[in-house]
From Swiss-Prot:
Name of the protein this chain belongs to: Restriction of telomere capping protein 5
TM ranges: none
Cellular compartments per GO CC: cytoplasm
Protein's UniProt keywords contain Cytoplasm: yes
Organism per entry: Debaryomyces hansenii (strain ATCC 36239 / CBS 767 / BCRC 21394 / JCM 1990 / NBRC 0083 / IGC 2968) (Yeast)
Compartments where found: Cytoplasm
Domain of life the protein comes from: Eukaryota
Main location: cytoplasm
Positions of the TLDc domain: 351-587
Amino acid sequence: MGQVLSKDNEDEANLNVTQKQFTKDKVLEYFNIQNHLQFRPVEIRAITSKLGIKNIKEKSDVTLNDLIYLLKIIKDEDIEGIDHNIKHVLNILSNSFTVIGNFPFLQSETTPKLSIESLMKSALFHTGRYKRLLTAEYDYLKLVFISLSGINKTYLEEKTSSSPSSSDDKEDTLYNLDVMGFSSEDEDSILSRKIKWNTFNVIQSFDDIDLDSIYVGAYDLLKLLTFFLILSSVPEMSHTQMQDHLSKSIARWSEFETYCLSIIRYINLDINVKNIKSTKISYEEFKRGISNGFPLFFSNAWMKIFKNGILSSISTTDVANSNNAPGSHGDANDNEVPKVHKKTPNFVESKLINDASISVISMCLKNMKSNLSITTQNLIKLYAGSESGFSIRSLESKIFKWQAPTLLLVSGKRVKNKTMKHNNRYIQFNEMYPSYFRSSESPKKDWQDDNDKMTYAVIINSPWKNSNKNNFGDEDTVILNLSPRFDFYKSVHNPVLNGKSIYFNNLGMGLGFGNSQPINKNTVKKFLPGDISLTIEANLEFAIFRHISSPNSNGASFFQKSKQNEISVQDFEDRFMISDLEVWGIGSTKELEEQRKQWAWEEKQAEARQSVNLRGLGEERAFLEMVGLVGNHSANGGSM
């Protein structure tokens, strides 16, 4: 659309940079012009048509009901009975978008209502288009933290009380902007293109906000992450199916929230059910936790809100009518319509696998940029101890014929002192498992609770086999901690170990991930646990996860230690009595790709309908009118 200078032109213009002064209102006007031009006409049309307006300046505010309609998260008829959790999240989103709407003057007092201008500016950042105006190095995560914080409440009140005249002075302040190839004859739309926004000191300093003085409420972040986890559980398929899937997942909010409580403990290990409403998360905790734990999940969720919702040409009417789309009946007249394929067998969830747990596991795989995809449509239950019995032979008979990746999950309650002292099978297991901690020190940490229920998962890419002598596996194996806290342990890249971190021993030594081959000779039976390892004894009754960060350990290192700030430097163990053990086969993603094509086709058809309306007006003029750059009697289109 010509909204940015080419590289050659920019290099030439850099030789002629002029510093000019502008008022705050003028700076905002120039930035807003450039913001609008980062969007396609069909995207602007998607917003205006859903809200029943001709241009984005026609409507002064966006209500929560408007936001629901734009996001397409529930059906129109369900708006009156909206879930209280969704209402909470909508308020968080609305407040966040309102703060970003002040950009670059983030310390400005915001209006109590969300505007379309703020929504558009939020779309600029959450879809990554800010890189066109700023740079790829701009700290997006810092902006998100500021937008989620209480900056417009506590922080601004303190600022105002300490310097009561500061806000008035700011309105009259002149700001220096670097302008490339400045000409006094430039119209606003042309001048806005010549400004070097990335050098503007207010943008570079985030308007001088003191990050140590603001925070994000842990409870609000829990609700937001739960919403994100629910969104990520919905695969791209026909929009009718997506909305139905989303509605069902929202109805099971508590299941997703339980996992998100584990996830938020990756940000702050001390958070629990009792203190979450009073806990505040600092910027350092926020940045470190999200950057190390789930950066793609966080940014992709924001992206999805705009891509599949606010900027999508699909309206709720389109969703309601999508069952009548040609693609649903295999219309032979349109060769681009996805073909209808037979449905995969109905997925039946288990004690350990449901939409919520799948969503967390998928989040991990995507963050690690794994080629594997896990959904309800490609998981096949191979073994469940509660159904087939907790027997190593039964486990072997169920999983060894599967020649594709598998997902193992094991769950149970922490072993208590009574069991340690009086359960003979545990005592025997403990004697075979070398102790790392001195008898005088407790291996249990303050953040571990006697009543914890632990769930670990392991992604295994190699086919299972008896490995009573040599380990098997590859460097794509990963151990996941799903509860009571979230964590992940990727394989170490080592040309000697070569990812051979797994054994399946049916001669009395069970299963091991991250261990060396156990010793099993004559009367000597001994496990050789690695620094980061999960050991399941042969009766499938007890398991131990070990995490040793100390450099003086003698154990093998098949897996990387935790990157969670507090955990990374700690030595600890999770010893638990197994209540559930399951293995699932990970099948083909062909069906997923077919459904994604159906989603893409519906989006394309909706955009085509919008484009017809735009061409009727003349696309360029229609776009300028929608963003409010020209009126009915103006022909100013210089920015194009």
